[in-house]
Amino acid sequence: MVVVVKVGREKEILLVDGGFKFLLGVNYWPRKLNIRMWRDWDEGAIREDISLMKSLGIRAVRFFIKDEDFADENVDIYPQALEKLRKFLDILYENSVAGFVSLIVGHMSGKNWRIPWTKFEDLYRSESIEKTMKFVERIVKEFKDHPAIAGWILSNEISLVKRGENREEALALLRVFSKTIKSIDKDHVVSSGDIPDSYLQETPNVKDYVDYVGPHLYLYDTDSIRHGYTYGAMLELFSNDGDIPVILEEFGFSTYQYSEDNHAKFVNEVLYTALAHNASGAFIWCFSDFIHESDPPYEWRPLEIGFGIVRKDGSLKPVAEVVKRFAKEVEEIEKLGIYTEFKRRPEVSVITPFYVFKDYEFVRYRNILGFWRSIQPVIIANILLSSAGIDNTVVYELDIEKTFNTKKLLVLPSTIVALSSTWRKMLNYVEKGGNLYVSFVKGLGEFRALHEAATHLWIELMGVENILEAGSPGIKYLGKTVIKFEKDLGFIGKGEEISIDIPVPVYTYRARPVDSEVIAVDNNNNPVLFKARRGRGYVYTMLLPIELIQSQIVVEYMDWSGKIQKIFRSIAKEVGIEIRYETPSPEIEIKPFYGKQSDIVIAINHGEHKKITITSTKQLKNITKIGGNAIVTSWTSTAIDIDMPKKSAVVLHVQYQL
């Protein structure tokens, strides 16, 4: 039999059948059976589901081996379970749907289900790992040649069953899993299937063991615009500047949480966001609602009954039409060569702090702040840049050297501390023609980084002297703070002011220039923005942690007036970063994919309904809409007018004069 798809890894994307195909997928339990799928097998019900999936354009299914239905305490696998799995894979094959198998389940939908051969507390112990790999080996050997198989996934959120006590304990399990799979099956991709703040999803640490990273993102935010942007920012974080392919392995909401209409708008926004941020696919949670509402865990987790794109009676929710339209459109976009003939060219990278993905003695910020708070400055910096029209990636601090030849600007946002070696590398990078923007923070609310120095190269790199009073926790900013520009900066003229509201106390450094220029001061005429020439490049030093201030840790709603974005656009202008396509509204995210004679441009409205104009530095020859639910109303040689409903997107093929 010919395989449904052959999925392989090439640098930052997964190749499907030798080319790029976006893996539009769903997570799956049967509508009529839910988690009882394997125990209460109903082939007719499953065929009905998969046939409907195919009609909607679904290309991939992530499904789950509920271990207690497959094996006993001695890891002896039930023959009838294997036959059911084979039949399920046959049904997928008949419908040309690719299967990604989650092997250790484990956790599912608000309940931890029994793993027969091990206690939860023993999951990472050698005896338990040996038994687990015996199970994995048996399943993989049995089905590695089945044409419906596309990939093997360790678990479903194993860290919710038992989190590794430390990074090495968790990675030991993943290493053995990867080695076991690859020793049997080198033809299919491998991933971990864990939660985003797990050790098993840390790209810098797992990239040698998995073929893609698959974050599970269920994000919440008072700011709907920031919420939409955050999905793309998280994909960039996990990509680590193209180190590894990324599939958005789980995302969604229950229509018992939100209306079906808003649910559909959300999925539309995220699908185009995933495509715009180089994701290799996106798997919606989940295919259908379930009819057995009193089954565990639905009895106490009613939201879990309603995540589907299909209702429990089999009728389609509005989101199903979104999925069907996206499936058709993405085929046309792929034919043009997105990701292969047309590629992004980001010239900026935002740096993730060293302590997020590696432990250092007495550096406890990841533990104190937690994963989500630790990454907020990075996420917001990515959002501010993207909403300023500046394409950018995210890169881990220990990997920054790989960006030195491809990025014109590196951004180190709201920095508590960076490695001494990082500062030295930055100096060398700038002297050779790169550019650096860095902002600092010493404290927020009750958090203080007291016994800390962000850098040792204040004068050598930034051209400033740190003049903070001995013993001070930092200069406090609270309430309305004005940034007054003493000199021109890109699009900002001397005398311009930008006000920022700071509702929570923020503590930072005070400095004076040594051989740098003071670009801006605060309300009290204290310098807050400096510019220093170092060799062939420039260093921009901001003493206000404006990225952290715009995070949901500090403010319920970001400032979407565009004035903060203007700072980044001005720096981008000064350092020669190309912004070929832009719009005045920061609520619109624009991601261009450049070709030799034309471009693909994806625009996503993360806000309310609006009419916008995208301007181009190129002379436009022809505009063709190839995707999305926004409407192109007119275009000229330099501008495109678009009517963009709330949470809508548009994909354009832009031909220009050569």
Residue ranges and their predicted role:
Residues 2-210:
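Active-site mouth of glycoside hydrolases
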Residues 30, 64, 157-164, 217-218, ...:
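Active-site clefts of carbohydrate-active enzymes
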Residues 414, 418-658:
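A conserved amphipathic helix/loop scaffold
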Residues 132, 287-347, 360-361:
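Aromatic-rich peripheral "rim/lid" segments of glycoside hydrolase catalytic domains that contact
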Residues 321-406:
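Aromatic-Pro/Gly-enriched surface loop or interdomain linker
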Residues 404-416:
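Short, well-ordered secondary-structure micro-motifs within conserved domains or adaptor modules
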Residues 97, 186-188, 242-244, 431-435, ...:
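A short helix->loop->beta-strand "cap" motif at the edges of active sites that frequently abuts
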